[in-house]
Amino acid sequence: NYEESMELNKLYRVRGMLDGREPLISRRPFREVHHTATRAALIGGGIVPRPGEISLAHSGILFLDELPEFKRSVLEVLRQPLEQRSIQITRTSGNYIFPADFMLVSAMNTCPCGKFPSTACTCTPAQIQAYLSKISQPFLDRIDLSVEASKVEYRDLVKESVSCPESSAVIKVRVCEARKRQKIRYQNTKIQCNAMLHGAELSKYCRLNGEEMRLMGQAYEVLNLTARSYHRILKVARTIADIDYSEEIKLEHLQEAIGYRTLDRKYWGRYV
């Protein structure tokens, strides 16, 4: 919207990145950061701090490829902005706060050679542990959706066309409708989307019935969830319900949301 566009343009102006070809940014940004990026490059820095990549991705997407290749200390600085949607940089001249409300998207292999858990993997357990331990549990808690991409079979690779249950265009319509539902639901509040729900708001808008409550209780114990990951599952389930045109969070919505957290247990639970 207009307010988001103006805020983003101010950030790019402070960074000196506006030019005559695109004097006004009207599209959501997509920022891809290389794994050699420093802490200052990511969150901002300088004697007089300037916005970093997380602020340049404000209202858009920040993409981190080869996630475990980043220094752990660099990844850890993302924990605050992922919660607060802003970053604070302190200097002797004062405190500087930059907006950083971005969607984090990342990709990674499960080991240095990229073939674990296949028998073709050449890594030792110690190498796998060292690789995965670059990503801490508190950082993982802030990841809402974890999806494992399976190996593409040769017969699928050489197919001239691959059929999909739904096209991107069809999915886009459902997502836009879900955002409209959220806009109506939160029209008299400061909340813009489900991801912004906290505290009492979760109890109000993510209410569960008996069967759903029992499932969440089981998941909390079996998956050893933290309070943060528990609340994030509720928000994801609320979004899945919206995409499914449902006012209530049903059992199948919760099951899908919980399924997006199982990679933590599958890989990090084994080696970290």
Regions found by a protein language model. Name each.
Residues 1-6, 10-18, 84-86:
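Post-Walker A helix-loop "phosphate-sensing" segment adjacent to the P-loop in P-loop NTPases
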Residues 4-7, 41, 53, 66, ...:
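Residue-level recognition of specific faces of alpha-helices
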Residues 5-6, 22, 97, 189:
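Interdomain boundary/hinge elements
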Residues 23-29, 34-62, 95:
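Conserved alpha-helical scaffold flanking the Walker A/P-loop in AAA+ ATPase domains
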Residues 28, 32, 67-68, 133, ...:
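Hydrophobic alpha-helical scaffolding
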Residues 59, 65-67, 77:
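Walker B catalytic acidic pair
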